[in-house]
A protein has these predicted regions:
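Non-catalytic accessory regions outside enzyme or core folds
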Residues: 1-6, 12-26, 30-32
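Active-site region of the double-stranded beta-helix
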Residues: 19, 28-131
Length: 133
């Protein structure tokens, strides 16, 4: 289940979220004023166990082209991190380490999930994305 939780920071902040929602429209409306887009795409069936990045990108070529046309996203890549991936541990550590990007990025989950923790001003947003996000 996709989930957005918004927390305040500082000494007076509560341990409970100020907002908790799994409604895609509410998530998009909360993120939009922060310059963060959120949408859902139709997941196109299950991936073959041996699907490579090129096959994944080909399945979503029209959606990718639409997003690229609407912003500055010159590069596209895909990663599939399965339990038997040869670099699974190193890649997992890379994704677990808090880091920033100097450019805008678009993420889409065909399968699996990922948690993004965004520190914006005096707010922390936790966005759990799953297949289709």
């Amino acid at each position: 289940m996709t989930l957005l939780q918004v927390f305040g920071t500082g000494p007076a902040a509560s341990a409970s979220p100020n907002l908790s929602s799994s409604d895609p429209a509410a998530i998009a409306a909360t993120l939009a004023p922060l310059g963060i887009g959120f949408e859902r795409w139709q997941v196109q069936g299950c991936l073959a166990p041996d699907a490579d990045p090129a096959a994944i990108l080909a399945n979503y070529a029209s959606e990718i082209a639409r997003v690229q046309a609407g912003g500055s996203y010159p590069t596209v890549d895909a990663i599939r991190l399965t339990p038997n991936h040869p670099d699974r541990q190193a890649l997992r550590q890379k994704f677990l380490a808090e880091h920033t990007h100097s450019e805008d990025e678009v993420r889409f989950f065909v399968e699996g999930r990922g948690l993004f923790c965004l520190h914006i001003g005096d707010t922390v947003l936790q966005l759990l994305c799953e297949a289709g996000d």
